[in-house]
């Protein structure tokens, strides 16, 4: 309030207090002080706007006068000023304590209620008035005057506070009922809350969000906003129902009417499909039989159940998703686990080879993915953990490679009277292995040379060889074994092998990590020895091209019998040219039986995917089984 308005309020309060004091004095004089005094106090309460009165000087003086009258007249009635907007008759508030004082009270009341009209002309509605009430209380009696916030006519009317009036409960009930009805009819028509907001935006130029419609239906908006939205939603609902009823018999152009807009009806929500219990049971049975039916199967099921094909298709899709949530597939794949195949056979692979260890029991062949197996027949190849020279009739490649990441099991071949068949299973991440050793006497000494490749990484595994290969039948083909191991059998044709020929395919990662760093390192060359019947064959020359040439120390006429071709890039050799290991070996019995050959070849400029070690059977014809691997 401005200072002028405050001054006006003070003047009005002073006038009211003076009128009250005059009325009390007149009443006291008419009664000739026959009644006892009463406490008359006028207190100006704070207005509604919480602005205190700054100059209550005159009121304080009037209060002092009233207190003096109180001491003189103790038995006067108590007068209370109540809110002027209360529509109550003054007679309801007057309780007379003495019959003599009732008439005087009514006269005083009339004097106080009839304020000068000129003072009220400057006030806005509601106009202030003073109503006298009497209450029998303690001798301490007060008269409380409550001024009302008033403004001159030149000032604007204060904004109405949104508080429910006496008539609003019925409006709230009506709004609640309308919101409930609106939601039901909207769902029946197939519109979403977002559709309603867009359609109302086209109708009234104001887009309403889906949240606003949702809050209206849930009665979460203010009363004022609910009242604003109700007529708009009511009009939209009537237009939607009229258009929906007319569109069934009218042309498609009705969809483009301005009542809803094309988006309104086009975005109708499809009704939820309800499937009966017996049909659901039949679908579950079909799902257990086949989780992914073809289009023909879905059509057949739809015809049997008298349902739409699309409904059946969607049900199967949803059911598969539910199955995934209930039974999630295991995260671990088979690529990291060993491949195991059992090959039971009571016969030996090569009956004429005396160095094979035969067994009639079924043997588990463990193949690690990083060391794929393409043929099960390993007759004369042994991977052991020794770094010393072996005995006669064995061509040895000795290396000091780092620990190998995998191990392959096969019968360990040695010219001793007893053959040690060791089974070693090692995972790709650990060298820990369980070794089972059995001893079987050999019927006759070895008649041809064998090739032994030694890696230090296999020392902890004792011996590594393909034991299960010995139990395969003699007519087992390379293609069958490769298919059993999950590999491509086209690496080498079985016709390239003689009876008992074998193929072991090593992954480049295995060779590079186990054999190549120590076979041909820059610091030291691996000790490579070719052994014949009369003793070991030392390295005689290393030419400029990197070819290693071995001489026959035993005087045998055979010079080149067991060549070895290795890729310099794949096996980290000294130069880019292939390195040939040429050795000579004679038969232990003096005859010129062919010795085993070990070949691995590829292009000298590109790394190979798989190095192929091939070993020819000692009892077969002299064959040079060379395999060229596919270049990357």
Curated annotation (Swiss-Prot):
Residues 268-327 bind DNA. Interacts with POU2AF1; the interaction increases POU2F1 transactivation activity. Interacts with NR3C1, AR, PGR and HCFC1. Disulfide bonds: none annotated. The keyword Nucleus applies. CDD domains: homeodomain. Its main location: nucleus. Belongs to the POU transcription factor family. Class-2 subfamily. Residues 243-258, 394-441 have a biased composition (Low complexity). InterPro entries: HD, Homeobox_CS, Homeodomain-like_sf, Lambda_DNA-bd_dom_sf, POU, POU2F1_C, POU_dom, POU_domain_TF. Phosphorylated by PRKDC. This is POU domain, class 2, transcription factor 1. One of its GO terms (cellular component) is transcription regulator complex. Keywords: Activator, DNA-binding, Homeobox, Nucleus, Phosphoprotein, Transcription, Transcription regulation. Residues 167-241 form the POU-specific domain. The modification Phosphoserine is found at residues 170, 274, 337. The modification Phosphothreonine is found at residues 157, 163.
